[in-house]
């Protein structure tokens, strides 16, 4: 895969992973009454890990699980970022905008990306047999 595409996918994955972990994980840690820097550190670790996973997996065709995982992470992250930031940019006064990305577009993109990764793997496998 082209290096520019790999960089773009990795950056989008890092941004989406950071924000999702910060807000969803931060809400869980809020109940335990933990300092804010722990939420930031946890979100940064998850973002770097997800970006590294996408960077390595986007460069080589993998097996079934890596294809499903990469498709799910990349598509889910793009859908989450679109659903999270889209309403903020289009309707700044709406306070429920980010919830669209957290509860609807992110999980739906994750599921559809996993299915797309499985279909892509099956197509590659079928073409390799011919």
Please describe what each predicted stretch is:
Residues 4-8:
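Intrinsically disordered, low-complexity regions
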Residues 55-65, 92, 125-128:
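Membrane-helix interface/capping segments
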Residues 1-3, 123-130:
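Short, charged juxtamembrane terminal tails flanking transmembrane helices
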Residues 25-38, 92-100:
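Membrane-helix interface and helix-disruption motif detector
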Residues 9-22, 39-55, 63-87, 97, ...:
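Small-residue-enriched transmembrane alpha-helices
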């Amino acid at each position: 895969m082209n290096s520019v595409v790999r960089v773009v996918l990795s950056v989008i994955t890092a941004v989406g992973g950071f924000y999702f972990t910060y807000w969803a994980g931060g809400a869980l840690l809020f109940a335990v009454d933990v300092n804010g820097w722990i939420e930031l550190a946890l979100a940064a670790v998850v973002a770097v890990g997800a970006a590294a996973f996408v960077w390595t997996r986007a460069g080589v065709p993998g097996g079934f699980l890596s294809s499903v995982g990469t498709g799910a992470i990349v598509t889910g992250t793009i859908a989450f970022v679109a659903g999270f930031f889209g309403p903020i940019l289009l309707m700044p006064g709406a306070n429920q905008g980010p919830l669209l990305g957290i509860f609807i577009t992110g999980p739906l993109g994750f599921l559809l990306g996993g299915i797309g990764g499985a279909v892509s793997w099956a197509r590659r496998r079928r073409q390799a047999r011919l």
